[in-house]
């Protein structure tokens, strides 16, 4: 052991005192000085004779029997997170503020077709594939990637396609200063090229979500084509230069359709997407509706008091919704019985219980009165009548009176 490189010796019987913070609780300061930049920097700052060891430590060290200085212990990485059956590492050091927000009351699907859909998407995400995810409104497309970003601490950005918006500004835009005009890099360009920089200086690649991509107009689709070139590992800059995309960056797109436009008349803002753009995505998936068992747990979590007081109302709602979804699949009902609709119906029932009380009411009374928040969203009278007809055999007491008129809003 080279004693000349270990610093000076404190007076016999005394502990060395740290010149930085005054610490004197050890015979040897070498381990303590790791928090102040290390022994070498300490001696450079306070002189080669600065006290770093006690007389007792020096005596043992000179005889070769002093304990070896401890190496700093590296902090352990957080355990991986399981997202629908697929394990993902957590990006330590990435704050929640840099990730997409965790949706309120979000539950990772565990049952039914949607759980299978999400597991396949997670496999593709694990492999860093570019993904197109479609599904009816309210099936949780954006929420899925927001939850994944939040749970894995993956930095994320969501860009929503709005008709008429300037998508080029996501990459760059003109800015003005005293010297005239200049190009100003946009948030998307910097995210694709630079990633997210942690406090320790290391970078973590982003997940980029392009939401409602099938709403893009023809001119917007041309800009999206340039953005999607980044899937090939490069992104165009303002002067035509090509920047490399940070390895590990993932681009996903969400849409109501599979790129062929709306063929049901329910999402009329959806446009036809050029096949050359669709081909840029390595994987494409269509989300199913959530399984009623998973939906029931979400409703119970959102409205625990009502669920406790009226334990059969929510299950009855979900039976109605399931019946409607079967009709949609057969093209017998032109409506979107999504989870948003279920939540609105359940919320209206819970609101009724809080504000007006439900004394003297039955399950059927509550279901009928609160159902108008769903029925009144129907686009026309034919659809409203069809919804009421699908409810009638399931709701206790029915929804159609003996005279044939509906009693959905009966007080």
Tell where the protein language model's regions lie, with residue ranges.
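Short, intrinsically disordered linker segments that flank or connect zinc-binding domains
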Residues: 1-14
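C-terminal recognition-helix end and immediately following basic linker
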Residues: 11-12, 27-51
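Short cysteine-rich clusters marking metal-coordination/redox-active sites
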Residues: 18-21
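Short coil/loop linkers at secondary-structure junctions
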Residues: 24, 39-40, 49, 155, ...
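Short functional micro-motifs and their immediate structural scaffolds
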Residues: 24-27, 259
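Helix N-terminus capping/helix-initiation residues
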Residues: 38, 49, 54, 274, ...
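Chromatin/DNA-recognition segments of nuclear transcriptional regulators
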Residues: 41-67
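C-terminal regulatory/interaction module of P-loop NTP-utilizing enzymes
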Residues: 69-411
């Amino acid at each position: 052991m080279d004693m000349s490189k270990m610093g000076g010796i404190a007076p016999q019987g005394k502990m060395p005192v740290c010149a930085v913070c005054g610490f004197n609780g050890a015979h040897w300061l070498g381990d303590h000085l790791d928090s102040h930049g290390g022994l070498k920097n300490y001696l450079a700052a306070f002189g080669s004779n600065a006290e770093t060891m006690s007389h007792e430590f020096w005596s043992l060290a000179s005889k070769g029997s002093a304990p070896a200085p401890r190496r700093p212990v590296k902090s352990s990485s957080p355990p991986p997170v399981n997202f629908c059956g697929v394990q993902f590492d957590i990006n330590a050091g990435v704050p929640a503020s840099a990730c997409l927000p965790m949706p309120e009351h979000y539950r990772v699907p565990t049952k039914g077709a949607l759980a299978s859909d999400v597991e396949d998407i997670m496999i593709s995400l694990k492999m860093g594939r570019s993904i197109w995810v479609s599904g009816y409104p309210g099936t949780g497309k954006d929420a899925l990637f927001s939850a994944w970003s939040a749970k894995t601490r993956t930095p994320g950005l969501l860009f929503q396609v709005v008709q008429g918006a300037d998508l080029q500004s996501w990459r760059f835009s003109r800015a003005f200063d005293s010297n005239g005009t200049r190009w100003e890099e946009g948030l998307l360009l910097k995210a694709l090229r630079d990633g997210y920089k942690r406090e320790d200086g290391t970078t973590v690649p982003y997940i980029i979500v392009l939401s409602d991509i099938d709403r893009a107009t023809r001119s917007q689709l041309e800009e999206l084509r340039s953005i999607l070139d980044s899937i090939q590992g490069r992104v165009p800059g303002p002067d035509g230069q090509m920047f490399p995309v940070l390895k590990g960056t993932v681009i996903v797109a969400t849409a109501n359709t599979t790129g062929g436009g709306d063929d049901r008349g329910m999402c009329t803002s959806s446009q036809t997407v050029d096949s050359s753009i669709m081909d840029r995505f390595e994987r494409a998936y269509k989300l199913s509706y959530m399984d009623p068992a998973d939906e029931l747990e979400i409703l119970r979590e959102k409205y625990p008091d009502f669920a406790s007081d009226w334990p059969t109302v929510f299950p009855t709602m979900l039976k109605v919704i399931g019946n409607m979804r079967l009709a949609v699949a057969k093209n017998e009902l032109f409506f979107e019985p999504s989870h948003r609709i279920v939540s609105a119906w359940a919320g209206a029932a819970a609101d009724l219980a809080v504000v007006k009380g439900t004394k003297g009411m039955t399950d059927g009374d509550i279901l009928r009165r609160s159902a108008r928040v769903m029925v009144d969203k129907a686009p026309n009278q034919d659809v409203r009548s069809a919804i009421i007809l699908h409810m009638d055999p399931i709701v206790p007491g029915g929804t159609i009176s003996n005279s044939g008129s509906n009693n959905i809003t009966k007080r």
